[in-house]
């Protein structure tokens, strides 16, 4: 009941028909984040793309200037010295066939998966499990790499991965309600800038169509896309 009252009060605070300036939207999303935990602030971007076409896919990995406020659990497929390097860098789970067996058994104790190139034949067999969860290592995202230390460190320091869904919408957590407003603004601008730079060649017409902010338990707050440089 308290949850419903909070949501109703938050919805009454937000004008759903208004597109707010970025600073105002940030202040509002922080104001309505009244849960008893530190809510995640999420951004949603509606893009003028059709991800069903290969030349219109938008996907990437970005290190936010102020981190996300969340510590990712990192899993690494590696052997020998590279496995030791991963552990030393702070990876949560490291292994080869033993880790693959755990994944096949449903034990997926990581939020980001990294692999050395020689492990991809093994990891490839886990595609049906890792793929739908967005955990499949990808060389384009820097998660298939010999620089295991760098990849683990980056993941632990506030990297966010983004990928357009079928409707051309991208969601990403860009901080916590406890963040200062200017820190959230820096993260948001960095994220939107990265998405704009990732504009695919096949995209036609207006690319960045809509933007919104929300907290874990709060309503969506529309953001005026003119707050961001045209992309």
Swiss-Prot record:
Pfam family, one: Ribosomal_L1
Annotated Gene Ontology cellular component terms: cytosolic large ribosomal subunit
CDD domains to which the protein is assigned, alphabetical: Ribosomal_L1
One record GO biological process: regulation of translation
SUPFAM superfamilies, per the entry: Ribosomal protein L1 (SSF56808)
Alphabetized UniProt keyword annotations: Repressor, Ribonucleoprotein, Ribosomal protein, RNA-binding, rRNA-binding, Translation regulation, tRNA-binding
UniProt superkingdom: Bacteria
Molecular function GO terms recorded: rRNA binding; structural constituent of ribosome; tRNA binding
Transmembrane segments: none
InterPro entries assigned to the protein according to its UniProt record, in alphabetical order: Ribosom_uL1_bac-type (IPR005878), Ribosomal_uL1 (IPR002143), Ribosomal_uL1-like (IPR023674), Ribosomal_uL1/biogenesis (IPR028364), Ribosomal_uL1_3-a/b-sand (IPR016095), Ribosomal_uL1_CS (IPR023673)
Oligomer and partners: Part of the 50S ribosomal subunit.
Function: Binds directly to 23S rRNA. The L1 stalk is quite mobile in the ribosome, and is involved in E site tRNA release.
Family note: Belongs to the universal ribosomal protein uL1 family.
Name the record gives this protein: Large ribosomal subunit protein uL1
Organism: Gluconacetobacter diazotrophicus (strain ATCC 49037 / DSM 5601 / CCUG 37298 / CIP 103539 / LMG 7603 / PAl5)
